[in-house]
Design a protein with these regions (language model features):
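Haloarchaeal acidic low-complexity proteome signature biased toward cell-envelope/secretome components but also
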Residues: 1-102
C-alpha cells in the first residue's frame, strides 16, 4: 500500500449524512458523523489498516452492526472496534455536536 491513500477521499458527506437518517438522530448529529467519516477516509488510515476503501455503504453496514443507538453512538461504537483492532482511532470519535447538550 502506498501513501497516496489519503487521496482516496471519495466519501461524499452529504450522501452519508442522508444515509445515516435510517439510524435516527438529528441532522446536526448526522452531519458531524459524516464529517468524521470523511476525515477518516481522507487520512488513509482505515484503508491502510483494513485494505478497504471507506464508502457510504461500508459505513452504513458497519454502523448497522451496532446494538442500537443514534448515529453518533453507532459511530463511536465502530471507532471503538477499530481502536481495539488496530489502535489509534480515538481521534475520529464524535464527542460533541450542535444540540448534543454536552
Amino acid at each position: 500500500m502506498t501513501d497516496d491513500t489519503a487521496s482516496d477521499g471519495v466519501l461524499d458527506p452529504g450522501e452519508l449524512a442522508a444515509a445515516l437518517a435510517r439510524f435516527g438522530g438529528t441532522e446536526s448529529e448526522r452531519r458531524t458523523v459524516a464529517r468524521q467519516a470523511v476525515d477518516l477516509a481522507d487520512s488513509g488510515r482505515y484503508r491502510s489498516d483494513s485494505g478497504r476503501r471507506l464508502t457510504v455503504d461500508l459505513v452504513v453496514d458497519e454502523l448497522a452492526d451496532a446494538a442500537g443507538g443514534s448515529p453518533a453512538d453507532r459511530w463511536n461504537w465502530w471507532i471503538g472496534v477499530l481502536s481495539f483492532a488496530y489502535g489509534g482511532y480515538e481521534a475520529f470519535a464524535v464527542g460533541r455536536y450542535p444540540g448534543s447538550g454536552e
